Amino acid sequence: YNHTAEGNEFGPTLCFRGIDNAAYYRLVDDAKEHYYDTTGTGNSLLMRHPHVLQLIMDSLRYWVTEMHVDGFRFDPAAPRARPFHEVDKLSAFFDLIQQDPVISQVKLIAEPWDVGDGGYQVGNFPPLWTEWNGKYRDTVRDFWRGEPRTLGEFASRLTGSSDLYEHSGRKPIASINFVTAHDGFTLRDLVSYNDKRNEANGEDGHDGESHN
């Protein structure tokens, strides 16, 4: 629920752009013909508009009550915390989740970042949420590569990352520890290369993360 398939303002009209562009999408304040993009996909949904919030909540409830889905992963999740420009964990989206008798009872997993300013929000999501722990991922990668001064950080990540979650009263289960995912290096590439080698796929090395 962070973007639709239109891409940016030069893409085709495939979804809500043709219904009510200004209601469903975040537009640049002083240039409404352009999308404000914090997702890296060309557009971002307008998370303070009632129609957008209703769309999200209605569809989530449908998946739980009719399809018996027991949890959701939000990729990325930080755009849902941007009713305006800044990330706000008290935004309407999180309030609706917290108060909903159905959705508040299922698993909620956040990829806690986006490409906007201040978008890296690991450790800052509300109590109902678990988070992909990007600090665990980066620390384990550094440790495997023999980077200096990572042993203490490595121990902290293995024992629950209390520096990230304890301040909000959350327990170690709030952290989803991972090393690789569908974004960036595969596990084999991770232990084989320091830099990405994507030239052969036609993107000339511009796609994917460079970090290892």
What do the PLM-derived regions correspond to, one by one?
Residues 68, 81-84, 89-212:
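Conserved alpha/beta catalytic core and glycan-binding cleft of carbohydrate-active enzymes
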Residues 1-68, 73-99, 119, 164:
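Substrate-binding/active-site clefts of carbohydrate-active enzymes
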